[in-house]
Amino acid sequence: MPQKRLQMLRGLIELVRPHNLVVAALTTLIGYGTVASIYGGDIVSSGYAYAALIVVLVAAGGYVINDYYDIETDMVAKPWRPIVSGRVSPGAARFYAYMLFTIGLIIALVTCPNFIVFGFAVLNALLVHEYSRWIKRTGLPGNIVIAFNSASTIVFGALYASCMIKGKVVLPSVALIPVLYAFLLVLGREFVKGIEDVKGDAIAGIGTLAVRFGVRTAYMASVAVLGLVVVLSPFPYISGVYNMAYLILALVVDVLIAYSLAILGRGVARGLEDAIRASRRARSALKLAFMVGALAFLAGLM
């Protein structure tokens, strides 16, 4: 294979962020597995494979289109990214993104011809596209969209499972527990990221909580949201759907959240520069907390 084509192929793979797609597939399994355990279906099945494939394709399209709309920013901040480095042309990237969106939505329509399931897939494709195009620059609404999209993989897995197992869309209320958990955890992480990026966001005119109201307010918002995650963490076990393995790992998540808030609180108390440095460590801890949380729900279903 000629060197140029090999570089383009590597660029196309890099654009879809494979490690993030693995996480998306796992969170889809949380929703699918929760509904399957309630209705007596197989957790790991061809139905789940289709659901994960749809989510992965739509998410991959979202990551590609994000790089497409971030060309100007990446020229300065990330010149090694596939498009700005010249490995993938902007036109090829845009075609690639729309192809991924289209294939994912076609699979959703063909494998589960249900208006709610297909409509939810379309909604998510539109949101990830519009987030990249303009919503990300709105600040708080952008934070909410990111949190929604992260949690929506669980919702889609649950909707798709009910379609495959029951033949109709039924969303048990207990399936919404991991959805709320993921939404709040990611939203809190977005508030922390807003502290980390406060200087650049202020220059770009992005109205995050940290920019509009200060890093202390953004910190207090993250405390409120992430504190709610800790408060809610026992309820999945209490519901009877998730076993003791969930509870043990959920406690690890709680510790990671407490750690991130503690180091961020100390940083905020010392001033802006310390807050920014502390937010990097806090965000890394929260990213780990999200992964452990996903594993908690998966282990809790076994």
Curated annotation (Swiss-Prot):
Biological-process GO terms, alphabetical: glycerophospholipid biosynthetic process
Task: Show the Pfam families listed in the entry.
Answer: UbiA
Q: Which cofactor does it need?
A: Mg(2+)
**What's the protein's topology in the membrane?**
Multi-pass membrane protein
What species was this sequence derived from? Answer: Hyperthermus butylicus (strain DSM 5456 / JCM 9403 / PLM1-5)
Q: List its EC numbers.
A: 2.5.1.42
Which PANTHER family does the entry link to? CHLOROPHYLL SYNTHASE, CHLOROPHYLL SYNTHASE, CHLOROPLASTIC
What is the name of this protein?
Digeranylgeranylglyceryl phosphate synthase
